[in-house]
């Protein structure tokens, strides 16, 4: 009797998904890092930027960590494509599996914190003055969320690549 077939994902598919993840996270980083607006108040003009809010700082942190992990995984994927050998052998598959799970859910917490902060700020009186800032923050969080979906796809692929043990 032959063993059941294993489902594996071709390395180039995994590489493409990781590159798409990196692109979304990079654009999210650029959008949130450059997000600022000058608002006129009774006390004078005030420049608001992402650094003024903990949730947006958290979004930047999750995006940076996500980009670092994704760059590492892209390097490993390129190595697998060019040499045909997986770095670290079968033990690396567990790092890949757990790392993908952690990073994907870490990214969604950054996006969720940013969405929540934006929603809270929109409910404040006078939020029309800084709606451009809030909309740009939502755009960055949305890109992080799209990056999360690509990271989940990578997570599913790494689950398929685990050896089947009975």
Curated annotation (Swiss-Prot):
Required for defense response to Xanthomonas campestris pv. vesicatoria (Xcv). In heterologous systems, confers resistance to bacterial pathogens such as Pseudomonas syringae pv. tomato but susceptibility to pathogenic oomycetes such as Hylaloperonospora parasitica when expressed in Arabidopsis thaliana. May be involved in the regulation of responses to bitoic and abiotic stresses. It comes from the Eukaryota. It is a multi-pass membrane protein. Belongs to the Casparian strip membrane proteins (CASP) family. Pfam families: CASP_dom. Residues 1-12, 79-91, 160-166 are cytoplasmic. Mostly expressed in stems and flowers. The lineage of its organism: Eukaryota, Viridiplantae, Streptophyta, Embryophyta, Tracheophyta. Homodimer and heterodimers. Glycans are attached at residues 36, 129, 135. The chain crosses the membrane at residues 13-33, 58-78, 92-112, 139-159. It comes from Capsicum annuum (Capsicum pepper). GO terms for biological process: defense response to bacterium; defense response to oomycetes; response to abscisic acid; response to bacterium; response to cold; response to ethylene; response to jasmonic acid; response to salt stress. Induction: In leaves by X.campestris pv. vesicatoria, faster during compatible than incompatible interactions. Induced in leaves by treatments with ethylene, methyl jasmonate (MeJA), abscisic acid (ABA), beta-amino-n-butyric acid (BABA), NaCl, mechanical wounding, and low temperature, but not with salicylic acid (SA). The gene is PIMP1. InterPro entries: CASP_dom. This is CASP-like protein PIMP1. Residues 34-57, 113-138 are extracellular. Susceptibility to X.campestris pv. vesicatoria is enhanced upon virus induced gene silencing (VIGS).
């Amino acid at each position: 009797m032959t063993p059941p077939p294993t489902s594996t994902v071709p390395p180039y598919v995994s590489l493409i998904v990781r590159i798409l993840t990196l692109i979304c996270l990079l654009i999210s980083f650029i959008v949130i890092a450059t997000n600022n607006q000058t608002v006129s108040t009774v006390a004078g003009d005030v420049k608001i930027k992402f650094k003024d809010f903990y949730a947006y700082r958290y979004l930047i942190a999750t995006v940076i960590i996500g980009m670092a992990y994704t760059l590492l995984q892209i390097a490993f994927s390129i190595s697998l494509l060019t040499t045909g050998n997986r770095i670290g052998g079968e033990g690396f598959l567990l790092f890949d599996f757990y790392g993908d799970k952690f990073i994907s859910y870490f990214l969604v917490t950054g996006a969720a914190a940013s969405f929540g902060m934006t929603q809270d700020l929109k409910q404040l009186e006078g939020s029309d003055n800084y709606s451009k800032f809030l909309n740009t923050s939502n755009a960055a969080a949305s890109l992080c969320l799209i990056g999360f979906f690509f990271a989940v796809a990578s997570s599913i692929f790494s689950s398929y690549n685990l050896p089947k043990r009975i």
